[in-house]
Amino acid sequence: MPAASPSVRRPEARRATAHFVQAALRELAADVAAGTEVPFALDTRGRYGGPALYEYRPLYRAFVEARMDRLVRLPDYDTAISSLGGDPAVLGVARDHAPDADTDEIALRSAVLVPLVVGVAEGAGGFDFDDRVFDGIFDRMLSDVAQTRRSFTGFAPVVGLRAVDGVHDLGQDIHARRITPAELAEAWPECQGLLPERYGLARDRLLALELDVALPRVDDVELPDTARRFARAVLALRIVFGGPITVGPVLFERVDWAPRAVRALPASVTQNLPGEPARLDPQRLYLVRALADRMADAEVHGGPIAVALSRWATASGATVSAERAAGLAASVEPLLGADGAGHHAVAMRAAALVGANAADREDIAIAMRSALRLARPDAPITDTEQLARVVGDVARSVLAAALDHGADASQLGAMLDAVLLGSRPRPQSVTNLVRSA
């Protein structure tokens, strides 16, 4: 015999929730009949380089949530909550989907009842109850209950990065791929105001970071820190490819394909940066993955790498080129000047690490010394925009080398002194890859 559908297996819950949804839709329809309008969003459509097209999308969720204080007073509300709350499996899914809920009642309301009312309204195109639409949503929810594992997904739009079509593995369960505003709007209709300007239209605004993991359905499982993982990925992309790569300003999370939360991202990876968009080279993604893993280790153990990364991320967003150049040069001091050797030693060590030949090393040393002197009141006037670009490339190379050395990064200064003395060769692989970006 074919397996019974989920709604057949839980007929009491289905009946109680259907009665509440019907009552809620009648209440909402009465508001519309009285002249209240459903708010709407204009979703952007089109292709980069072409005109923007707009699609009208009613925001049923906002309309429903604004009236929940009335809907919870409907007689069928308590019956639905009692029926759903009596099922431990349903209650567990509700807690997963509404992690910030203070009570089980709020979790069931946010994760089950509101999505049902909103889903039926969206599926029916208004506030008429449709059995088929209701059953489809209710059965999908109960299918989640039957699963022994749950899917956890996070999205965040990327700016300042171009790539060929495909899915690009950035490590730590994160991928970069093209995603349209329409795809995001399917789960988050209100997302249009939370996306970067011209997202989905400009060539460097077509990608998103996506975290997708399967987790056991148990109460004490630790959910991924999506914001921190995305921040590592963006910083690793910036180090390897350069360019004004940013993400956010917010990320979108969902569990089992149902919206879970919209969260803020760290300012260090959301602030606008100067420069031309970078191009993702799939051949260098192995380095992005390696650097992101080393950043995770640095977050745990701290030390000079963590300090240097924090300074570099902050300095990269400086709007004044002189401040940016000085900050980028100072960001590598915890790595190259931890022994207190001074600015000259930091500049020489950076040149020894990054310079490809004698002339290149001389230029780097001069640039680093100039940038480190910018904080002084008697600093000479220079082309600080060009200086910031040169020092920025040097800082990226130093950070890549330090992360590549891992726990030995504290000895980077001593190692480079040996390079300057000619007693050991210059490490080349990582710094060459980063500088040629």
Model-identified regions with their sequence ranges:
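Histidine-centered, metal-coordinating catalytic motifs and their short helical/loop contexts
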Residues: 358-392
